[in-house]
């Protein structure tokens, strides 16, 4: 647990002396988040510093590879810059991490359910791992699609259509055989939607089946942990102790 590892706060403080305000202002992810949260007029220092805090999270435990989405690439580059600057002053102490992007390009930057921005808790456009089956279905059935696709007979657009973006990310050949056997693959589904004659409700129901299958085992495991909260705290305690030791090395 981050709050139980004081070394992370210490590293953040040390690193803050290696990064300029102007460099943080140029970080594309920071700029986007400032705009998203309407912080232009008054930026909290803690928020502005979070790329440095993230660098501490990564380097304290000598991470060599960091799995990220496309929008986090500037953050990792910021970390790499801090590592290079630190090592140039204090010898080769820190590990410069590489990034690991999803092989499926559609997974690199999933939009929120509203289709306008990335998933954000503050915007309420997220599907959470903790969501119930009903919550997930409600969010999927209200997903942004194609505003010009008013009638089922109307030709539709798959580009910029949030449902198809999620299908690109999560659908597999077996899903069609199980849930939508009249189509051999996703391309056939896209072609039909583009021609017209395929309604949004049908593709949303298909996506819901896929997402429920994906989230069901996660939901079940979470339910098991919820039955023994003291055990969860013990896992967090032991994990924090282990990482404190690793951060000291």
Q: Where are each of the predicted segments found?
A:
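Conserved nucleotide- and phosphate/pyrophosphate-binding catalytic cores
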Residues: 80-246
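Divalent-metal (Mg2+/Mn2+/Ca2+)-assisted nucleotide/phosphate chemistry catalytic cores
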Residues: 1-115
